[in-house]
């Protein structure tokens, strides 16, 4: 891949390692992965990792030996009852760390990464939404920015840029004709598109709860409680158990006493879940370490929860709210889709 001048400059500056923590930010389609690949070649003993297994898989598909942050810096141990726990590794056999999808890194994980006193390069996207309720945001002041969308970045990246600049999604169709990867859905027919996608993204929790109930009903679920093969998402970080806020997986078995086997991209864990959280519009999460883990269905999620994840086929239900910048919201939602994007103005 031929590097642009912008990419060359960024790579040249970063490898000088002038600061212990450097932040590189780039919009979707600016070639961040290409830059990471070159950094890995120039800094051979740097570990490459990402917050989710999904993001690590994307890097692996591009030829990098990527891990999740969790598998890189936490080590598993088993207690007398054969329960598996995780604790921070005592040392790291690398000269430094490159972290992709850095917008998802919480303050706690940031501190754990810094513990090893190695140079860290965070890579993320300053166009995405700011984390909700979290004052901490690695991407708020990047050292370097990639802002040129590459011609071959694909239709979805160009569409995401178009709406980030404030243009109406509906005018894209008029301007560009019907593309292969973006389909516009009429307001009343969004439910028919639901079952054709891997992820529904909306703005409001009320819509999220409604859409999750609708999809589960279509799938033949009999109760509001989790059943085998339900898709669920963890709602709080629990480093000890290896769970992270926003981590998606599938229920493989249901046990007595509100316990299920949760299979994520990393592993399968038997977990006590909180039955009162499912289908709630507003979550009342108990942050006590001893409390059962909060999960909810994730057929539909909000754009804030979708940050940093990528899905093959996505349905976006566009909804406006004064609490955040709508252009950033729409950009974040659109850029989650990899192969096919259905867009519905609600």
Residue ranges, per PLM feature:
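Conserved ATP-binding/catalytic motifs of P-loop helicase motor domains
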Residues: 1-346
